[in-house]
Swiss-Prot record:
UniProt-annotated stretches for the region Disordered: 1-23
Gene that this sequence comes from: tmem120
Highest taxon of source: Eukaryota
Protein's name according to its UniProt entry: Transmembrane protein 120 homolog
Provenance organism: Dictyostelium discoideum (Social amoeba)
Coiled-coil boundaries: 25-96
Length: 368
């Protein structure tokens, strides 16, 4: 009893001795936290003030950009008027040199104004962009914003191309499911609209995209919409397996094409022969690069296969319509025409690109 009592007494004494130390530690920790909170608050206030200043500076920058745009428009108008006045002058022979010199100066001013307007004039894009976004400026002033646009475009293609394969698997597993079929049709429409919209915005911001690929996606949008409006009839059931197989082949070839184009584009950007926001390695401005590589040759037969598959689809739709004596849905003729345009356009573009590659390769070998 006495021993336990003494132990209890000693433990109480120990607790009394440690309690002040513990309280000191807590007080010190609270003081440190208090100091950090005040430092954070001070830093936040400074950041807030800096943000207000930066916002004002940005507004001033855009105001100056608007002033520059208005001045450039004024210069363009004045230079045109002066050129017109010079043309209407009945200058004598000894004054011809002066008028030619002045005309040359004015022509150079017009060229410079045109180049400057590309950088400073806001753009709303094509009719297609305005249809979805309205009259808003889609041009970015900062290079990192332009590059982000391109990155997001590449990410979108990388994420969505495998979905071609996924929908093919689902359509083969559930060929009679209207839910799967409708989901696939809606997804195709969403895919091509998004691609066309992003490419139009990239085009405004200086990206190099062949006009055919923009037109290709417009035609694909029309085809996807036609497919979505196709009633679940005999003709739809007849063509569904064929179009499903085509979609799977197209998805595989697009995956291969994107890998090749990104690899070549990175190489050309590193060599200084391409713009960092370009989306393919097939720009006409890169004619000095041979591009005749094993990967390009490997891709060639796959591209031809898909393009001839498109032409075969077109023939199948028209042949089906020709063989039927009764009523044939307008979607059959529409799909046949769209596949014909896509097949011919893709085939001619591919042959043109590879012919240019061969010419560049031959020229490169002769020079080296």
């Amino acid at each position: 009893m006495m021993e336990s009592f003494s132990e209890t007494k000693s433990s109480i004494a120990t607790n009394k001795s440690t309690t002040p130390t513990h309280e000191v530690q807590i007080s010190k920790e609270l003081q440190d936290i208090k100091n950090e909170v005040f430092e954070l608050k001070k830093s936040h206030e400074q950041c807030k003030e800096k943000g207000i200043k930066v916002k004002k500076d940005i507004n001033d920058v855009f105001k100056h950009a608007d002033d520059i745009t208005n001045t450039l428009a004024k210069h363009e108008k004045e230079s045109s008027q002066l050129i017109s006045r010079i043309k209407h002058l009945n200058a004598k022979e000894k004054q011809l040199d002066i008028t030619k010199e002045l005309s040359a100066h004015l022509d150079q001013i017009k060229v410079n104004v045109k180049r400057a307007k590309v950088s400073f004039t806001p753009e709303t894009g094509s009719i297609f962009v305005r249809l979805f976004l309205g009259q808003v400026n889609v041009k970015h002033m900062r290079e990192n914003e332009k590059f982000r646009l391109k990155q997001e475009y590449e990410k979108f293609k990388k994420k969505t191309n495998p979905q071609f394969i996924l929908f093919v698997v689902l359509l083969l597993l559930y060929p009679q499911s209207s839910f799967v079929t409708t989901s696939w049709q809606i997804w195709l429409l969403y895919y091509y609209i998004t691609l066309a919209l992003r490419e139009n915005i990239l085009l405004v911001n200086g990206s190099s995209i062949k006009p055919w690929w923009i037109m290709h996606h417009y035609l694909s949008i029309a085809g996807s919409l036609t497919n979505l409006l196709f009633p679940l009839s005999e003709s739809f059931s007849y063509f569904l397996p064929q179009v499903t197989y085509f979609s799977g082949c197209q998805g595989l070839v697009q995956i291969l094409t994107n890998r090749y184009q990104q690899g070549r584009l990175y190489k050309l950007v590193a060599m200084g022969k391409a713009n960092i926001i370009d989306v393919t390695g097939e720009s006409e401005g890169w004619g000095n690069d041979p591009g005749w590589t094993p990967s390009a040759l490997f891709l060639f037969p796959f591209l031809l296969f898909v393009q001839f598959f498109q032409l075969y689809n077109s023939f199948s739709f028209f042949a089906f319509a020709y063989q039927r004596s009764g009523y044939v849905e307008w979607q059959v003729f529409s799909c046949g025409f769209i596949f014909l345009c896509l097949g011919l356009g893709n085939l001619l573009t591919t042959l043109s690109v590879y012919y240019q590659k061969w010419k560049n390769f031959s020229k490169y070998n002769k020079e080296n």
